[in-house]
């Protein structure tokens, strides 16, 4: 464990220096890791674990996702099974189905949770809102979590590049006395950059807040608002998109991601610098009440209720596609499609 200062607050983190890959292999040497679900997080975690030398199998229903698993080298009947077979064979059952899928499959999964097995999550949703999901693990199994702070695709890409994606970790239930060791070993196995401790409740709450806030919901709302204002005042789609999205994603985002917002402010034009310093507090004051409202909606379980209710509707997928199609057809993103085609790396040489 390493002590690190995060903005004046000391936290304990774990990296491969404190918990080596060799130690992780030793901790999990007698385990059969069953990755249940090969959708979003499943491929990255399963392939990283396999490449790091762990005993991994995959459980997936037939369909396109099953075919993807085959294409990734998982062999039917050897390392690729039905969900039921994988759950029976596995000693660590990794619940990497969607939140809705976890609720649906729980009656099946719990049949195979024999004493001493481990139930693994990468999101606290099902456990934290168990009153709504019905997911209540038996007392004689370990319940652990490693939650990558990014997509499964990013986890795999960074692993293949020799880098790691930061992860939070938590132990909800330690029936064997070895739950924390298994958790840290699993984090190293999937290719964590560094790991920081949390709880299922804090992970679920912060994750839903982030997705609805600055990571997805708020950023779409902010970008669209600026784009619309520019267009309504006579700016072309190309100009509006470049000043709203392209410069952010291709130039500024990588800069403040690598060096910090303060560095970016210190290394831009004086005009941009002055304007940003003056307007940032106004946006903060306008947005913070909405963020507080959002956090309350998450914390009280309202967002979980909305998610579960929506996913339980038989026509949800059709309705979702209509919503995504509406976003896809927004002028801003149609303009963006053309802008992306014009990037040098997308030009025919």
Question: What are the roles of these predicted feature ranges?
Answer:
Residues 2-6, 11-17, 232-349:
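NAD(P)-dependent Rossmann-like dehydrogenase/reductase catalytic/cofactor-binding core
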């Amino acid at each position: 464990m390493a002590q690190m200062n995060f903005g004046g607050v000391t936290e304990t983190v774990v990296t491969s220096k404190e918990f080596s890959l060799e130690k992780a292999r030793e901790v999990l040497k007698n385990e059969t890791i069953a990755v249940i679900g090969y959708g979003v997080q499943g491929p990255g975690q399963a392939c990283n674990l396999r490449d790091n030398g762990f005993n991994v199998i995959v459980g997936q229903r037939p369909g396109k996702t099953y075919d993807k698993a085959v294409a990734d080298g998982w062999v039917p009947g050897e390392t690729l099974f039905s969900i039921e077979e994988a759950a029976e064979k596995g000693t660590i059952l990794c619940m990497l189905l969607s939140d809705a899928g976890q609720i649906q499959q729980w009656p099946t999964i719990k049949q195979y949770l024999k004493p001493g097995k481990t139930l693994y999550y990468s999101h606290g949703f099902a456990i934290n809102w168990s009153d709504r999901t019905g997911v209540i693990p038996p007392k004689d199994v370990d319940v652990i979590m490693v939650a990558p702070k990014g997509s499964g695709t990013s986890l795999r890409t960074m692993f293949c590049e020799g880098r790691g994606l930061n992860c939070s970790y938590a132990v909800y239930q330690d029936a064997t006395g070895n739950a924390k060791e298994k958790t840290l070993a699993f984090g190293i196995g999937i290719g964590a950059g560094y790991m920081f401790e949390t709880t299922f409740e804090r992970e679920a709450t912060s994750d839903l807040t982030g997705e609805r806030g600055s990571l997805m919901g708020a950023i779409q709302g902010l970008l669209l608002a600026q784009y619309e204002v520019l267009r309504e005042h006579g700016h072309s789609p190309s100009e509006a998109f470049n000043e709203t999205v392209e410069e952010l994603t291709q130039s500024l985002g990588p800069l403040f991601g690598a060096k910090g917002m303060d560095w970016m402010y210190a290394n831009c034009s004086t005009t941009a610098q002055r304007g940003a310093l003056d307007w940032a507090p106004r946006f903060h004051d306008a947005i913070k009440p909405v963020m507080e409202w959002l956090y309350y909606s998450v914390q009280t379980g309202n967002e979980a209720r909305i998610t579960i209710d929506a996913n339980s509707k038989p026509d949800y997928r059709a309705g979702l596609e209509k919503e995504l199609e509406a976003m896809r057809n927004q002028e801003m993103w149609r303009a963006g499609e053309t802008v992306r085609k014009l990037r040098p790396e997308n030009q025919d040489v």
